[in-house]
Amino acid sequence: MSAFFLNMKKSIITQKIIAKAFKDLMQSNAYHQISVSDIMQTAKIRRQTFYNYFQNQEELLSWIFENDFAELINDNSDYYGWQNELLLLLRYLDENQIFYQKIFVIDKNFEHFFLIQWENLLDKVIFDQEKKSDYHWSDLEKSFICRYNAAAICAITRESIIRGNSLEKLYSQIVNLLLAQIKIFES
């Protein structure tokens, strides 16, 4: 393996260690009470290393959203299929519920990012379904079903997170709803 790829791998590992330290601190502290020094002390890495990867805590937070969801949605879609991918995502959100409860309260931009991630997953649902069916979806139909359902699922999962309810319990309802809507479009 080349030095470039080794450094890149080391970089991602370091970012994940920093992100985990931040998430751990969020379990017992308010977002605004956590300093970069606190994060790096928890990570057991020198403070300056934080700034090699992130300008500030907001950038770290954005990286966490993008990285965690991308790993769950993009990295697993071909291997697991959309239904298992959905289940993995709901379980992940359940396991990290306190973190996301706090984030929803302090960061209104996260809701938009959360919506985009649901749209990405639903794009894959339609793509997967289109491969299994003779029906060819128009761009308008794809856009409608993805955006409509993403908004609904985003709102329901956000509310469940804030209330502390299990998201895994929503799994069969979400799957059944999506399959029923797909069947309507395909008929």
Swiss-Prot record:
Keywords assigned: Activator, DNA-binding, Transcription, Transcription regulation
DNA-binding region, residue range(s): 35-54
Q: Which GO molecular function, any one, fits this protein according to its record?
A: DNA binding
The protein's matches in SUPFAM superfamilies, at most eight in alphabetical order, are given as: Homeodomain-like (SSF46689), Tetracyclin repressor-like, C-terminal domain (SSF48498)
InterPro entries the UniProt entry points to: Homeodomain-like_sf (IPR009057), HTH-type_Tx_Regulator (IPR050624), HTH_TetR (IPR001647), Tet_transcr_reg_TetR-rel_C_sf (IPR036271), TetR_C_Firmicutes (IPR039532), Tscrpt_reg_DhaS (IPR012738)
User: What positions does the domain HTH tetR-type occupy?
Assistant: 12-72
- List the Pfam families hit by this protein, alphabetically: TetR_C_8, TetR_N
Record-linked NCBIfam families: DHAK_reg
Reported function: In complex with DhaQ, upon activation by dihydroxyacetone, activates transcription of the dhaKLM operon. Binds the inverted repeat sequence 5'-GGACACATN(6)ATTTGTCC-3' located upstream of and partially overlapping with the -35 promoter sequence of the dhaKLM operon promoter.
How is this protein organized at the quaternary level? Homodimer. Interacts with a homodimer of DhaQ.
PANTHER family recorded for this chain? ACREF/ENVCD OPERON REPRESSOR-RELATED, TETR-FAMILY TRANSCRIPTIONAL REGULATOR
Give the protein name, as stated in the record.
Answer: HTH-type dhaKLM operon transcriptional activator DhaS
Its source organism is: Lactococcus lactis subsp. lactis (strain IL1403)
